[in-house]
Amino acid sequence: MLCFADLPSEIHHRIIFHLDSNRDVAALSSQCKALHSLCDMSNRKKYSRVRITPSISDLDRAFKMLMDILRRRSLGRYVRHIEYRQTISRYCQYDVKPYEPKLSEEDMRLLRNATQRAGFTRALQERVLNMLVRELVVGDRLYGTFSDTRAPATYVTQALTALLVSLSPNLESMAMMPTFYTNFDEDTADSFMHSECPLDLLLRETNENPVDKPYLQNLRRVYMINLGDDHSDDGRLYVAMDFIGCLAILRNLPSLEWIGTDALAEDDNVLPALGPKSSNVSCIAIHHSAVATSYLTPVIRSCRALKEFEYSIGGRGSVNGTQPTFNPKTFFLCVLEHKTTLERLDLDVESHIFSTVYRGPGDFEFDEEDGRAEAQAYWIESPPNSFWDQRGCLKDFEALKSLSIGVHFLLYFATGVNNENDDKIVPLVEYLPPNLEYLCIRGYEKGKRKRNDAQMDALKALLDSDSTSLKEIHGVDECIPNAEDIDFPDNYPDLLWKLPDEWSDEEE
C-alpha cells in the first residue's frame, strides 16, 4: 500500500504550501528525513514573524530579513505576521540625505526592483530607497533609536515595513499603529495631511485597487496598536485614535476578516466617512474602550456581513471624567441589520448605559442622546429612515450562536424595538435566538430583583429540558460583574489594562 512518505516530492511541496500553521508543518517534518528537509523548519521559524520599530536593533534585524528575502525570494512565503510600531506625531516632509554606499551594486539593484514592484516609481522610488538605506547614517541615531525628530524614524520604519509586506504573499496578520498623520488640534475639513509614508501609500493604493496585486491578498487579521499620538499613552486613560480612518484604508482588502483594538477613545477626526456595506471586514473587536454609539454605528454598518462583534469598556479611566453615550436602541438597530449573519455578540457595556436600573421596558427612553432625533440633527451622516424604522427583537437573530451581555441589556434585546412588545415584559425563554448555543449573562445577582430571578430560573429549566439549542449558560448561579471605568487610575494600577509586549519567534 502506498504511504504518504512515498508520494512524489511535488505533491509534498503542494501539501506543505497549503499548511497554515508552522506547528502542523513541524509535525509533518518529523515523519521522515526527506519531509524534514522539504519543510525547511529552521527558515520557517526564522522568517515567520518580524517586528519593525525605531529601535536600531529591530531595524537592523528587519533590514537583514529584507535583504535575505530579496536574495532568495522563496523565503518571503514564510512570513505570516508583521508588527509595525511607530507613531506619526506630525507631518514633516522627508529630508533626503546622502548615504554611504555600503551595499553592493547587486543588492542595490534588488532593492530598486523591489521598490518598483511595490508601486513606488520615479522620484518617490528614489526617496523610498533613501529611506531604506538611511539607517546606515550614524547622525540619525541617538541612544539606540532614531533621534527625537520623528520624521526619519517614521519614514525608515514605514519603508522597511512596506517592502517586507510587498514581498510576503502569504502574510496573514498584522499588528500596527496608524500609518497616517491626523491633525487633532486644527478644526479643518481636510484632516488628513498629504502623505509620503510608504506603508500608508501601499495600504491605500492596494485598498483602492486590490486586483492583481501580489501582496496583501491573504491578510485576514489586523490589530491596531493604540499607543496614542507620539506614544502618549501612559497606561491610565482611554486613548484617542482614528480607528475609523484605519478601517477606511483597509476595508477593501480581499481576505480581510477581522480588525480590533484596545483602550480606544474617540478622536476629533470626522473623515473619511464609512458608507454602509462598504467593508469586507466581518469580525470587529474593540475592548477596554469608551466610545459613543454614534462612533460605533458607522463601523458596524460598514460591514457587508457582520459575523462577530465584541465591545467592552473598563480597564482605563476617562479623559475628563465623563462617559460617552451608549444608546442601546441605536446599537440594537445597528446589529439588527446583520440579524441573518451575526454569529457571536459579546458586549460588556452596561455600566455606560444611562437608566440601567431596569424595572420594565418602558423605563428605557433612548430616542434622544445618540438616538434618532439627535442623529438626524447633528451626526455628519445619519442613517436613513429605514434604519430607524426597523422592527425586531432577540429571536430574530437567526444565526446567533454565542451571546455575552449584561442582564438588563439582554432583557431589552428580548423585548426589541418598534414592535408590539414595546412597554411590555416578555418571557426571555420564548425570545431566545433559534440557534443560540452559548449565553453569558453579566451583572445578575440572585435575589436583587424577583422579576429577574424568575427569568433566570426559567432559563435554567429550559437548559435542563433538552428542548433547546442552548448548551451553556453562565452568570446565573454566580455573578459575573460588569466592566467599569477606573475612576482613580493612579490608585488602582493593578486594575489597568496594559498592552502585552510579549514577542517571540514562535507562532501564535
What do these predicted ranges mean?
Residues 2-267, 281-282, 436:
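N-terminal adaptor/linker regions at the entrance to substrate-recognition repeat cores
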Residues 298-313, 323:
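Acidic, serine/threonine- and glycine-rich low-complexity intrinsically disordered segments
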